[in-house]
Amino acid sequence: MMETNPQTSEGAGKAQSSAKKVKNRRKLRRTVAGAMALTIGLSGAGILATAITPDAQIATAQRDDQALIAEGKDLYDVACITCHGMNLQGVQDRGPSLIGVGEGAVYFQVHSGRMPMQRNEAQASRKTPRYTEAQTLAIAAYVAANGGGPGLVYNEDGTLAMEELRGSNFDGQIDPLDVSRGGDLFRLNCASCHNFTGRGGALSSGKYAPVLDPANEQEIYQAMLTGPQNMPKFSDRQLSADEKKDIIAFIKSTKETPSPGGYSLGGLGPVSEGLFMWGIGIMVLIAAAMWIGSRS
């Protein structure tokens, strides 16, 4: 009978234990390495996806949506086709072509109530709009889909920009520096027609520059960009986007700032003040003279 050496058995046991530990360590290393590789791979894939994925195009998706364009076409066929033609090509002696005017021009005209016109006249005047903002954007999308042109200004979340257009440095409050720059630009480019406070004025041939108070920020921006009716166009090469915003800041600041001298008399400056002095002041003096004469 063969005898077992205790030292040999002990050595064999240690060898097996050591081999098992090595095997476990290798297994642990493989597990850790696999987890790290998976983590690095997923992280790299995420970074790569972020890098190659374009920015959110919420606004573009809204404007290019086929259902929105179809809705706009239906509205166009009801209200616009008579004057602007079946294919937006315009109708002689009725309405101009809309090809290439862009959604900005449509928004200004329709949202301000100028279009559809109630009657043919020298100039379309502002009135209560016939269509809601959503319907207006649908018509604008249809026109933009057939010729392109200047677009509306949207926020990053896809909403239509309004107060965000109040100055190039707007952060919830109008920046006084924007108002100062906007005032200089307004007096240089706009005051000759709209008056230095934006209250409008008469032009030739029965036309006029409208009061700017009722216009919202998007309307003012699009008016500068598209040049409706008698107004010149101010492209981004003539007035940059920030300069347009600064002009809007000046207009809104002028409207919302109380007159330190009391009633502003329409904001027409020396004209209205002089008329008040002659029309009211002289009458008061005449009445006072007559009263003094009757007492003597």
Swiss-Prot record:
One GO cellular component, as annotated: plasma membrane
EC number: 7.1.1.8
Any one GO molecular-function label of the UniProt entry: iron ion binding
Record keywords, A-Z: Cell membrane, Electron transport, Heme, Iron, Membrane, Metal-binding, Repeat, Respiratory chain, Translocase, Transmembrane, Transmembrane helix, Transport
Region (Disordered): 1-27
Polar residues: compositionally biased ranges: 1-19
Domain Cytochrome c: start-end pairs: 67-147, 177-255
Transport listed as a keyword: yes
Gene3D superfamilies xref list: Cytochrome c-like domain (1.10.760.10)
Positions contributing to heme c 1 binding: 80, 83-84
Catalytic activity: a quinol + 2 Fe(III)-[cytochrome c](out) = a quinone + 2 Fe(II)-[cytochrome c](out) + 2 H(+)(out)
Subcellular location: Cell membrane
One Pfam match: Cytochrom_C
EC primary class: translocase
Chief subcellular location: membrane
Stretches that traverse the bilayer: 32-52, 274-294
Subunit structure: The cytochrome bc1 complex is composed of a cytochrome b (QcrB), the Rieske iron-sulfur protein (QcrA) and a diheme cytochrome c (QcrC) subunit. The bc1 complex forms a supercomplex with cytochrome c oxidase (cytochrome aa3).
Protein name: Cytochrome bc1 complex cytochrome c subunit
